[in-house]
Structure formats: C-alpha cells, structure tokens
C-alpha cells in the first residue's frame, strides 16, 4: 500500500523538546514531540522516524537553536526521505509580504524569527506582540510597517522552578499547576502563584508599555509548550496558537530566495 503524501515536514529543534509537524493542504496534519537530548544518536532519531513517519514528503524545513544536533538530523532526513533539509535562519533572504528588518539585521533565534514572521504573514494584524513560553519566555514585538521592533528574553517557568528547588533547602519538589488564587497559604501554593503570576504581570506589563511607547494598537499572540499554564490568568485579549513556530518555519522555507543559499 502506498504511503499517504504529506508534502512538508517542519521540525523545530528546541532546548527542551523537538517538535515535528506534517502539513497537508496548508493544515497541520500531525504534530508530535520528542525530548531534546544533546547526545541523540543517528540510530535513535532514525528509529523515531520509522515509528512515527509512515509518510512521503518532498520538503523538510528545520529551525534549530541546538546546532550540535543539526548534522544528525540532516543525515537522518537524507537517509529516510532522500531529501536535503533546509535550515532556516534570520540571516537568509526571504520573499515575504513585509520587511522584517528595516535596518541592519541583528542576531535572532530562528524560532523567535519564525514566530514573528507567522504573526504578520498569517494574520491581518499591523502590530503584534508575540509571547513564546517554553524553556525561555520570549516577548517580541513586530510591525508590518516597521519590521521587528525588538523584545525581551527571560527564563521559562520550569527553569525558574528548578532553580528555586536547587537553592531553597526547605522547598521540596511538587507538581506545578496553575494557582487558584494570587495569595496562597501553603508553601507549594505560594510557589505556584509566584511562578505563574510573574508571567501574567510580565506579559500584561510589556503589552501595556509598548502600546504606550508606540502609540499604536498591538495584538497579542501566545505560543509555547508551557503557555497553557498561564493562559487562564491573562486578562488581555489574545490568540493562542501552539503551531505558530512551525507555521513560521514553513512560511520561511517556502519563501526563501535560493540564490542566497549555499
């Protein structure tokens, strides 16, 4: 029996997890993850592909913030699909509907870059604040008219939680969850409250400040593997899109100017 055709495989290699998205008819048909391991071997990745990807693809686009794994994935993909994957980056040339850089290009993680591109290309917004809550918490602003405005990078909730456990002798590990109240009466409840309300106030504070700074309306888009823990706390209208990064990687891969690719 022939394998079903899914034309594009998008891979987002992050610090905590590696996301795989298969696109069919411009929709995410399959979305799965594996844990990031800096020691991942060729045979481990190949076995993962055998178990999960009984599909044909004709394009593979990758965003990676863990370059030590790039060669392994490149080799596995070529062996498995007979395709050379394209690694997207902020410093390549793309044919987009807007110019991300109105001045000199500056160093930007490929995942952040993909988020910002998707926020403009996939939505009819003029100005967007994009929050990605994963290993790190990134909050970046982008404008259709002025390009990427900049942003802030903070540690994500799990890093903050583990740092507290490592440095506070009397606080023992417990499951983290969205707090019921701002002010809690137990240690675990208070830690949960502090852990997640800080992101609520960070996101809402940055959102209000940039609106005042630029005197413009900004739409808010939230993504990231840990975002679900804070969504119920946010009191500003927002869009949640768990696929924002892979959508951006796909847009970039399909709009690249191959004259500038080695």
Curated annotation (Swiss-Prot):
Active site residues of this protein: 111
Give a Pfam family name: Pan_kinase
Q: Looking at its record, which EC class is this enzyme?
A: transferase
| Main location per the UniProt record | cytoplasm
Reactions catalysed, semicolon-separated, are: (R)-pantothenate + ATP = (R)-4'-phosphopantothenate + ADP + H(+)
Q: Which EC number(s) does UniProt give?
A: 2.7.1.33
Q: Which CDD domains match?
A: ASKHA_NBD_PanK-III (cd24015)
Q: Name one GO biological process term.
A: coenzyme A biosynthetic process
Required cofactor names: NH4(+); K(+)
Keywords (A to Z) from UniProt: ATP-binding, Coenzyme A biosynthesis, Cytoplasm, Kinase, Metal-binding, Nucleotide-binding, Potassium, Transferase
Cofactor stoichiometry and binding remark = A monovalent cation. Ammonium or potassium.
InterPro entries registered for this protein in UniProt: ATPase_NBD, Type_III_PanK
Tell me which residues bind substrate.
Answer: 94, 109-112, 187
Q: Which residues bind ATP?
A: 12-19, 135
Q: Name one GO cellular component term.
A: cytoplasm
Cellular localization per UniProt: Cytoplasm
Family of this protein: Belongs to the type III pantothenate kinase family.
Q: Which NCBIfam families match?
A: baf (TIGR00671), PRK13326.1 (NF009863)
**What's its job?**
Catalyzes the phosphorylation of pantothenate (Pan), the first step in CoA biosynthesis.
Assembly and interaction partners: Homodimer.
Q: Which HAMAP family match?
A: Pantothen_kinase_3 (MF_01274)
**Record-given protein name:** Type III pantothenate kinase
Organism of origin is Borreliella burgdorferi (strain ATCC 35210 / DSM 4680 / CIP 102532 / B31)
Gene name of the encoded protein? coaX
